[in-house]
């Protein structure tokens, strides 16, 4: 049992930036990319296992014909607000509809470990935005794992936030690949012909020489940590990005701290308005975007 090939399929803009989350790119682009991935996954390079974000369920119909254990999902939300699993283009999978894993590196380790029984070969596909792909990029660099990089490069900016991809995560050389025609009446049918389709192989860098690693180990204990800044720095890693509503309001406590007029802890009442201003109501993560 083992992974013979890893392919990362994602979107890029002209500045080599990924959409930070799935909701930061057009759902029509994801629909096209997932269909391309399903067609490419039929190549005879091992059993295909496609990892995608949970919030692409409505756009992942081409993948649902795969066996359940070969189409795992990752819930990439970093918010504490309740998920939207019923409505909207970016609704998530229902419970038990798909196998859930922690992240793409966890899926790779699960497939690559030794197990008793017949030896099976897998082709791992990672399809998504920066919140899904970047943790795998970091894992691949740490473990010196090479992978195929398949991207659709658009001419337009993302609907939401971009995440610039460091050069170490990009292939040094790329060639073009020809996508299969878009489905009839696709919203981006005219634009898809203007996009670039890049394919390359990301090769891990050479290991540091043993002498250099030894010197680093000697100097590391004597490095003084920098004083902490008084201003909190915003989280820039794509896996730590909350939704826009969460970023615009203070953290909501888990339990209400108000009491009723009778001070009955078993029957807390609703928060009272101060003047003409009502307290903020609870919200649901629901990314709104346009096709």
Swiss-Prot record:
Protein's cellular compartments: Virion; Host cytoplasm; Host cell surface; Host nucleus
Region: Disordered, residue numbers: 223-281
Superkingdom of origin: Viruses
N-acetylglycine carried by residues: 2
Broad class of where this protein is predominantly found: virion
A GO biological-process term: symbiont-mediated activation of host NF-kappaB cascade
Record key words, sorted: Acetylation, Activation of host NF-kappa-B by virus, Host cytoplasm, Host nucleus, Host-virus interaction, Virion
GO cellular component: host cell cytoplasm; host cell nucleus; host cell surface; virion component
N-terminal signal peptide: none
Subunit-level organization: Interacts with host KRT18. Interacts with host MAP3K7; this interaction induces host NF-kappa-B pathway.
Family from the record: Belongs to the herpesviridae HHV-1 US2 protein family.
Its biological purpose: Plays a role in the activation of the host NF-kappa-B pathway by interacting with and thus activating the component MAP3K7.
UniProt-recorded name of the protein: Protein US2
Organism: Human herpesvirus 2 (strain HG52) (HHV-2)
């Amino acid at each position: 049992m083992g992974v013979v090939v890893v392919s990362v399929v994602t979107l890029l803009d002209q500045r080599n930036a990924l959409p930070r989350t799935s909701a930061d790119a057009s759902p029509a682009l994801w629909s096209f990319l997932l269909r391309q991935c399903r067609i490419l996954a039929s190549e005879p390079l091992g059993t295909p296992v496609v990892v995608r974000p949970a919030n692409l369920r409505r756009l992942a119909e081409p993948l649902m014909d795969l066996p359940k254990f070969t189409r795992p999902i990752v819930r990439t939300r970093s918010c504490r607000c309740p998920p939207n699993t019923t409505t909207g283009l970016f609704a998530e999978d229902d419970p038990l509809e798909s196998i859930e894993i922690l992240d793409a590196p966890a899926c790779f380790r699960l497939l690559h470990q030794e197990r008793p029984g017949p030896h099976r070969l897998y082709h791992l596909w990672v399809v998504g935005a920066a919140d899904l792909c970047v943790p795998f990029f970091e894992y691949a660099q740490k473990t010196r794992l090479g992978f195929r990089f398949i991207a659709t490069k658009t001419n337009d900016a993302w609907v939401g936030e971009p995440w610039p991809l460091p050069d170490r995560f990009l292939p040094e050389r790329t060639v073009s690949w020809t996508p299969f025609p878009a489905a009839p009446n696709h919203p981006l049918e005219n634009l898809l012909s203007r996009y670039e389709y890049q394919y390359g192989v990301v090769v891990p860098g050479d290991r540091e020489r043993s002498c250099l690693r030894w010197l680093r180990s000697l100097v590391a204990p004597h490095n003084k940590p920098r004083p902490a800044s008084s201003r909190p720095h915003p989280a820039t890693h794509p896996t730590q990005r909350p939704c826009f509503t969460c970023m615009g309001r203070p953290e909501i406590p888990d339990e209400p701290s108000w009491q009723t007029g009778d001070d009955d802890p078993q029957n807390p009442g609703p928060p009272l308005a101060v003047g003409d201003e009502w307290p903020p109501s609870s919200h649901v993560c629901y990314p709104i975007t346009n096709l």
